[in-house]
Curated annotation (Swiss-Prot):
Organism: Escherichia coli (strain K12)
Family in the record: To lambdoid phages excisionases.
Protein name: Prophage excisionase-like protein
GO MF terms held by the record: DNA binding
Entry's Gene Ontology BP terms: DNA recombination
Length: 81
């Protein structure tokens, strides 16, 4: 079973020298740039040991004139405002 590592532990394992700073890793975690995504547990962000940085994934543009059903689908099934 894969372990959940703190961002610092993950960076030390992935980068042999000159890892990103902790604040940069936290920003990446908040922006969902890890695959699988990082999870916040208490005060710490944790990622699976096999996690990778994937960069910005494309998100669909939701227009106000789109149908309500399409807006719901594009917003991951959550209710529209």
């Amino acid at each position: 079973m894969l372990q959940m590592l703190t961002l610092e532990e993950w960076a030390a394992e992935k980068y042999r020298s000159n890892p990103p700073s902790v604040s940069t890793l936290r920003r990446y975690a908040k922006q969902n740039l890890f695959c699988p995504p990082a999870m916040k547990q208490g005060r710490l962000w944790r990622v699976r040991e096999d996690a990778e940085l994937v960069g910005e994934l494309v998100t669909p543009v939701i227009k106000k004139n789109d149908s309500l059903l399409l807006q719901r689908i594009l917003s991951n099934g959550s209710q529209t405002a």
